[in-house]
Amino acid sequence: MVKYDNQKQLKCSFCGKTQDQVKRLVAGPGVYICDECIELCQEIINEEFEEDIDMGIGELPKPKEIKEFLDQYVIGQEKAKKALAVAVYNHYKRINSRIKPDDVELQKSNILLLGPTGSGKTLLAQTLAKLLNVPFAIADATSLTEAGYVGEDVENILLKLIQAADYDIEKAEKGIIYIDEIDKIARKSENPSITRDVSGEGVQQALLKILEGTIANVPPQGGRKHPHQEFIQIDTTNILFICGGAFEGIEKIIESRIGKKSLGFGAEVQSRKEKDLSEILSHIMPQDLLKFGMIPEFIGRVPIVVTLDPLSKDDLVRILTEPKNALTKQYEKLFELDGVKLEFDKKALGLIADMALERKTGARGLRAILEEIMLDVMYEIPSSDNIEKCIITEETVLKKAPPTLVYSDAQKAKKKIKKTESVS
């Protein structure tokens, strides 16, 4: 505070009020500012800061726009993309709305993605976070255990999100967390057991509070909580949780519920092999998840259940070529950096898709297959001169012949890469 000077009446350089008209007058090099102007400046800064952090309703993409963005990265799964687009739009619309205390309360709706391995569950969640420009974290449910046992506490999931937000808690509180392998924490048996299920039902119980919305205490360095430790507090009310799992065998539970009950002559019998798996999964109900081993309280906190279809051969071929970051486009870019144009024969792409289906790894297995095929090619080409084009054929995929090379000489002679001796 500036002391009163009888020689000169000090006044605020901004509003012009004298020292005796205000409570405080702060002095700087040749200037003064009063407490009223400081308060006004603080209000202006706070308003601008809130506008920067809050995603306005006008800026929030509409469900159709969200689906169009997902289409650029995720092939197929039309029903799942539509359901996710609506769910995510409603979630962030709820966050951005300024609801009065006496108004209708909009509850959070977390999402459960259910589908085979490699069908695009993780990619869908990652792509949503990319579009919305919010912090995103992936957690593995299999590493979680109930508090007090060896393994990770559920609060460590939140630490990953805080780290993704560069420890900006306000930003993290509007993020997305994808919990993978959620089916692995199913109750080990349908009936409650005397022995404690610390990595199954116990984890489900521990997740309930953060899924619903609570002020969680997170250890800054991760690991177990202990007394006299400082914690980071984070409100999970507006964090969107997307849980994903393959739920292998749940189709049998659904079938037993919707299947025909009649027996004897004339009974209508239809085996699961004759039914389409995606059609069976589309009939999933909460009681099926309950019978699988998920507890009722957990099911209630993930009300939106989205099923993903198994990927067909055509889907896998499209995944190889169509998305913005398609695998073939990535390899083409790598070869382009060496001045070589890379092409994949249509039959070769079909064969790669067949191999992925045979391995039952879905889209996730495509990269491993391509790495095996491309190893010798990527080893030889950087050392070869004057190569203009490299064509991956069906024979190359089967490892019966090297790829076709087009050289940039006058004759455009086609040559073959000599097979490198394989070490058995």
From Swiss-Prot:
GO terms for molecular function: ATP binding; ATP hydrolysis activity; ATP-dependent protein folding chaperone; protein dimerization activity; unfolded protein binding; zinc ion binding. It comes from the Bacteria. It holds the Pfam family AAA_2. CDD domains: RecA-like_ClpX. Zn(2+) binds at C12, C15, C34, C37. PROSITE patterns: CLPX_ZB. One of its GO terms (biological process) is proteolysis involved in protein catabolic process. Gene3D superfamilies: 1.10.8.60, ClpX chaperone, C4-type zinc finger domain (6.20.220.10), P-loop containing nucleotide triphosphate hydrolases (3.40.50.300). GO terms for cellular component: HslUV protease complex. ATP binds at P116, T117, G118, S119, G120, K121, T122, L123. Keywords: ATP-binding, Chaperone, Metal-binding, Nucleotide-binding, Zinc. Residues 1-53 form the ClpX-type ZB domain. Belongs to the ClpX chaperone family. Component of the ClpX-ClpP complex. Forms a hexameric ring that, in the presence of ATP, binds to fourteen ClpP subunits assembled into a disk-like structure with a central cavity, resembling the structure of eukaryotic proteasomes. This is ATP-dependent Clp protease ATP-binding subunit ClpX. It comes from Thermoanaerobacter sp. (strain X514).
